[in-house]
A protein has these predicted regions:
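Intrinsic low-complexity, intrinsically disordered or marginally ordered coil/linker segments
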Residues: 1-148
Length: 148
């Protein structure tokens, strides 16, 4: 059983390329059955890799996307993936759609990882994440913008 990683993504590019990618993702979401057998369902990242014309066996795609929405030249969604973010999928998207760049924020508590590639904080302002169990056995989870 893997540790699960929750990630949020923002993909930004030309309105045309973002619209094409969004169309592919929405078409996959409307399917009754995934055309690539898997344990995740119709929104498995491997289905997206396959729909982009690539071999899902050569890309780390061990998870699924959720809640995709498009606004102008921006696409936003979340993923639940095993052990860490599956950025190979998004690197592939950037090769297929040269104008698109992706930004992400991910948390994988089992591996004590909090990651982002948004150095300027344009989409994800938090730079630090802390999980604490108090002596009273209370769990606290907080994000911070800086070291203070």
């Amino acid at each position: 059983m893997p540790n699960w990683c929750s990630s949020s993504y923002v993909l930004v590019g030309s309105a045309d390329e973002v619209k094409k990618l969004y169309g592919i993702m929405k078409k996959l979401e409307r399917r009754k059955k995934a055309f690539v057998e898997n344990g995740f369902g119709i929104t498995w990242l491997g289905c997206l890799v396959d729909a982009l014309g690539e071999d899902w066996k050569k890309v780390s795609c061990r998870g699924e996307w959720n809640a995709v929405c498009k606004r102008g030249n921006t696409l936003r969604f979340t993923t639940e993936t095993a052990w860490g973010p599956c950025n190979q999928v998004f690197d592939l998207i950037c090769r297929k759609y040269p104008s698109i760049r992706y930004y992400f924020q991910s948390e994988e508590p089992g591996m004590v990882e909090y990651l982002t590639n948004d150095k300027e904080g344009k989409y994800f302002k938090d730079k630090y994440c802390v999980d604490v169990y108090t002596p009273e056995k209370e769990f606290k989870h907080k994000h911070f913008l800086d070291e203070q």
